[in-house]
A protein has these predicted regions:
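Cysteine-centric segments in proteins
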Residues: 1-153
């Protein structure tokens, strides 16, 4: 039996969110890729860009596409560069799964780190969902991401 939510929590903490983890070889020109494997399940995250980026996450079970999510994120204050990612996004994403009332496809519903506030609002369930992730610095919105995904049949 597939426990997708538990696997996603493990995988996300062992890929992009974890700054200690190295990328794997890119699968497409100029892509940045991460991969996590456990038993018969594989998680692959590939994205393009830096402060403005687009990407997708795919879960394979027994070598078959099982679940996927795509996302597009924009840093609204370009002077911050990677600062928002390092001080707010990655640490927030490491808290995936802490809120039991929200599906583990990004971070928690809300997370605060000093002057940064992360929030994620999602509708639907792990089978079919859409969400908006935002980061504020001193109450000013500096980043937004939209995502959607679900089971692949």
């Amino acid at each position: 039996m597939v426990n997708l939510e538990s696997f996603l929590i493990e995988a996300k903490k062992q890929t992009y969110a974890n700054e200690k983890v190295e990328k794997v070889s890119n699968t497409r020109q100029n892509s940045k890729d991460y991969e996590y494997k456990k038993d018969k399940m594989v998680y692959h995250d590939t994205y393009f860009g830096g402060t403005n980026f687009i990407g997708e996450e795919v879960v394979y079970v027994d070598d078959k596409t099982y679940w996927a999510m795509n996302y597009y994120g924009v840093t609204l204050d370009e002077t911050l560069g990677e600062e928002a990612m390092d001080k707010a996004l990655r640490p927030a994403l490491m808290n995936v799964g802490k809120d039991k009332d929200i599906i583990p496809v990004r971070g928690p519903k809300e997370w605060i780190n000093g002057e940064y506030k992360y929030s994620f609002d999602v509708t639907g369930n792990i089978n079919c969902f859409s969400g908006i992730e935002t980061i504020y610095k001193n109450n000013e919105k500096i980043y937004e991401l939209k995502c959607n995904g679900g089971l692949i049949k």
